[in-house]
Regions:
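Flexible, compositionally biased loop and terminal segments
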Residues: 1-170
Length: 170
């Protein structure tokens, strides 16, 4: 199981909200078209389709925290010395782009959720609920794999017993 926090989705999220980042990437001009976001969504769908065809299960979670809850968590991080490390002043600056981020999230979820690589939008104001919802989705995905421990044939069992005998005689 691999977990990516944002990953390649940054290119259709932060870069979309802050288009100056796109300009600073120094991409060839022919790649920056009016269709750049749709092209990037298509690239993401194709990449995840490739992963699916190679046996990788891709599930994605958007932890939907309300603006009010985010504010409360920021204040808690400021007030609690053990959580100060979690807070950055840039968090408040980015909060000013809330509506832009919500639009970007809506577009990326709408354009990159597929049957084989779905997005799960998780209400995340309640951390316990969010954790249960995520765990449930992961368990369901694992169950659908119908995984079983490998079995060994009689020849392998005999080989293991012979090795065990050698080890016991040391």
């Amino acid at each position: 199981i691999g977990i990516f926090n944002r990953s390649y989705y940054e290119e259709v999220l932060v870069v979309r909200v802050h288009e100056q980042i796109l300009k600073n990437q120094k991409l060839p001009e022919k790649l920056i078209t009016n269709d750049i976001w749709e092209e990037r969504f298509q690239d993401i769908r194709n990449f995840e389709k490739y992963l699916n065809r190679n046996g990788t299960v891709v599930i994605k979670f958007f932890l939907n925290v309300s603006k009010k809850e985010q504010k409360e968590r920021f204040i808690e991080r400021i007030d609690d010395p053990d959580k100060n490390w979690k807070f950055s002043t840039s968090d408040v600056k980015e909060r000013g782009y809330w509506d832009d981020y919500m639009h970007a999230y809506e577009e990326l979820i709408k354009n990159t959720s597929t049957e084989k690589s779905p997005w799960y939008v998780i209400p995340a104001d309640n951390k316990s609920y969010a954790r249960i919802a995520i765990a449930s989705a992961i368990i369901t995905a694992l169950d659908e794999l119908e995984l079983e421990y490998p079995t060994v044939n009689d020849e392998k069992i005999a080989e293991l017993q012979a090795i065990k005998k050698i080890l016991l005689e040391e």
